[in-house]
Amino acid sequence: MCIRDRDKTIDRPALAKLVFGDQEKLSRLNAITHPNVKKEIFRRIQRIKEKGEASFIAVEAALLLEEGYQNDFDTMWYVYVDEATRIERLKEGRGYTEEKCHEIMAKQLPEEVFRKECSTVIDNHLGISETENQIKTAVESLLSLY
């Protein structure tokens, strides 16, 4: 199976099809990619700090808890949405089947772990304006600490 498009970029749906059904392949992919992702995240953070460009830095990436980022960051946030909404969004946004959605979600940490490890929970099922309000409140709270 080829996982490159004609322009030699990664064909993300093909890669997902290849690894999400095989835990060993997924683990190998994560072992290859995530150390490099982590290096790049911290390289960018260092550059931003050196330039004094921000009051705070937000990082959004897959597997933050699984890769131990909670030991590196001041705070962790969890953006929550119920399972039915997640499935609906994955089907609409990425064209996944319901089976594919369940397969992916079964490999993720349970919600309880995120709620335990993260200091802030953003409820993302109430619509974009309510989500924005929650984020604004959380950012203001964070900035008041520093």
What would you call each of these model-derived segments?
Residues 24-53:
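Phosphate-binding/switch loop-helix module in NTP-utilizing enzymes
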Residues 1-3:
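Short, small-residue-biased leader/transition segments that mark boundaries at the very start
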Residues 21:
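Glycine/small-residue-rich loop that forms an oxyanion/phosphate-binding "nest" at active or ligand-binding sites
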Residues 12-16, 26, 38, 58, ...:
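A general structural signal for well-ordered alpha-helical segments in protein cores
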Residues 18, 32, 44, 89-90, ...:
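Amphipathic alpha-helical segments that mediate coupling or scaffolding at interfaces
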Residues 29, 58, 122:
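Residue-level signature of catalytic and energy-coupling elements of molecular machines
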Residues 40-41, 70-72, 92, 96-143:
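Small-molecule kinase domains that catalyze NTP-dependent phosphoryl transfer to phosphate-bearing small molecules
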Residues 42-50, 56-93:
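ATP-dependent NMP and nucleoside kinases share a basic, alpha-helical "lid"
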